[in-house]
């Protein structure tokens, strides 16, 4: 059996990653592949919580820029994350992985309400728990949700699964060929250098709770498993100052 470095994880998946090459909506082929990747880690006995973004369907900031009330636009974004969570739940259960979707906004016909102790109990029973609906409050990103849930469930690490990005760079490597990838950073480094890995609220919370982040390319098969085993891929952001 493979050696596991992280026993309980939060996996943060961007909405764009679920859209595949289309860029918007949900690609069933991507869901199937991602479910397979998560199953590899699940079968190693790792306890898994998943936070999905909603950017493949809607962004609250975009709605606000178009004239919508920001809070209303953010609630729409929260609903988008729940739709993504339902799609991923279906993919995982089709792959044979018991899964529970918990939402911060009550919708009992489709998901459980988020309750911290229940979520931990599910994980201890080897069920994957998907956290939908963000924090349940406007103005907070799903990155902040990932940092918050990681703290609440005592996760060992937050895995920032990026769509085609294999780590944190000094600049956008697509625009600057001389950009260098960081092997390791601290949360304070990330904030002081203005690196756009996650928003400042999420970064500050992760720094306060000392939970490390690993930024890696989720599109490479086997990468989630490699990270959990401790292989040095991507960029690790230490949970200290």
From Swiss-Prot:
Broad enzyme group: transferase
Activity modulation: Allosterically activated by GTP. Inhibited by UTP.
UniProt: UMP binding residues: 54, 74, 135-142
InterPro entries: AceGlu_kinase-like_sf, Asp/Glu/Uridylate_kinase, Uridylate_kinase, Uridylate_kinase_bac
Coiled-coil residue windows: none
Residue ranges, annotated region (Involved in allosteric activation by GTP): 20-25
GO cellular component annotations of the record: cytoplasm
Subcellular location: Cytoplasm
GO MF term set: ATP binding; UMP kinase activity
An individual GO BP term: 'de novo' CTP biosynthetic process
E.C. code: 2.7.4.22
Residues the entry annotates as binding ATP: 12-15, 55, 59, 163, 169, 172
Record pathway: Pyrimidine metabolism; CTP biosynthesis via de novo pathway; UDP from UMP (UMPK route): step 1/1
Reactions catalysed, as given in the entry: UMP + ATP = UDP + ADP
This protein's UniProt keywords: Allosteric enzyme, ATP-binding, Cytoplasm, Kinase, Nucleotide-binding, Pyrimidine biosynthesis, Transferase
Top-rank taxon: Bacteria
CDD domains: AAK_UMPK-PyrH-Ec
Function in brief: Catalyzes the reversible phosphorylation of UMP to UDP.
Similarity comment: family membership: Belongs to the UMP kinase family.
Summary of subunit composition and partner proteins: Homohexamer.
Stored HAMAP family: PyrH_B
Name assigned to this protein: Uridylate kinase
